[in-house]
């Protein structure tokens, strides 16, 4: 569980802009510690001992006289056999972060998620585990130094990273109450590796009458051709061009997706994740994106390619002064995962 104010501060601080998440010190050296190729392996040095099966909440114990880490230590407790994690990949992962210098409290524990009390009172523990969606070696949910040791690890692995809090968390460690010489322990269950430059796979269906044509392949933005002489539809329209077989997208999840957006009036691309060399990650169904996306993408499936035509009132119509305020928008969205 996350019982303390420090844990709440970690969530709050890690939500600030990426500029504040830059690690103060570079990457640490990896240790050669105990590695396992099955469930129930153990890592111990010199701060924490971690035990437990992949997929179950890890047990982390710290002896009172344990030495504090001076170098970053990386242990693969359970060796997976899936794809390797590459620099910049997205991960679906179980995550536990503990400060052994503060009564062994958990700063983050996705095996014991917290939810708001509907009565408006204190938070209550939820009934089941969740996963974190994070990007490796990039300012994201965690600072780069905390995830860089996962590069080269295989999907399906349980990994323990422990070391200096200042080095792994960065300058914000002091905001969280850490002092020089304090340690921090991360336990990752790497459930899914998502290629940040990937596309969904499958045969694309012909577009419906009156919908833009779409060509999407490689690592370039999709080519969107507006039907000649057609007025834009007045209502929100969408079509699944490639049907995925993954889980249904639920409101409140973090969507990891590639997308290209073009204006109906001239067909010009105004935004694309491909221009940033990585998929985008955002909350869906919670008002973080335009209304048309929330309405269509909730209920889609992971692996879908979705074509959306969005009228101004469900696009940027409410954003006064926006360049696209009066524009009908066309998007092609590849849903890579929903965490």
Task: Give a label for each model feature.
Residues 2-339:
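Cross-family detector of peptidyl-prolyl cis-trans isomerase
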């Amino acid at each position: 569980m996350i019982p303390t104010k420090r844990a709440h501060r970690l969530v709050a601080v890690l939500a600030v802009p990426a500029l504040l998440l830059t690690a103060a010190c570079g990457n640490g050296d990896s240790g050669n510690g105990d590695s396992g190729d099955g469930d129930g392996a153990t890592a111990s040095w010199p701060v924490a001992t971690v035990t437990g099966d992949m997929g179950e909440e890890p047990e982390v114990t710290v002896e009172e006289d344990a030495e504090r880490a001076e170098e970053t230590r990386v242990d693969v407790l359970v060796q997976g056999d899936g794809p390797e994690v590459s620099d910049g990949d997205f991960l679906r992962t179980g995550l536990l972060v503990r400060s052994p210098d503060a009564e062994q409290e958990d700063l983050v524990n996705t095996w014991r998620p917290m939810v708001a009390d509907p009565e408006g009172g204190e938070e209550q523990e939820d009934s089941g585990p969740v996963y974190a969606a994070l990007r490796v070696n990039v300012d994201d949910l965690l600072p780069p130094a905390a995830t860089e040791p996962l590069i080269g690890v295989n999907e399906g692995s349980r990994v323990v990273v422990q070391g200096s809090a200042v080095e792994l968390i960065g300058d914000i460690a002091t905001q969280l109450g850490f002092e020089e010489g304090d340690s921090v322990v991360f336990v990752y269950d790497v459930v899914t590796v998502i290629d940040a430059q990937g596309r969904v796979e499958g045969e694309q269906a012909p577009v419906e009458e009156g919908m833009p044509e779409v060509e999407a392949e490689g690592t370039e933005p999709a080519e969107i051709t507006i039907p000649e002489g057609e007025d834009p539809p007045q209502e929100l329209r969408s079509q699944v061009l490639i049907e995925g077989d993954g889980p249904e997208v639920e409101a409140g999840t973090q969507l990891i997706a590639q997308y290209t957006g073009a204006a109906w009036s001239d067909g010009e691309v105004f935004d694309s994740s491909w221009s940033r060399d990585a998929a985008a990650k955002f909350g869906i169904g919670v008002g973080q994106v335009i209304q048309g996306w929330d309405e269509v993408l909730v209920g889609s499936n992971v692996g879908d390619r979705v074509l959306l035509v969005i009228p101004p009132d469900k696009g940027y119509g409410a954003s006064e002064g926006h360049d696209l305020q009066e524009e009908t928008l066309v998007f092609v969205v590849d849903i890579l995962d929903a965490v």
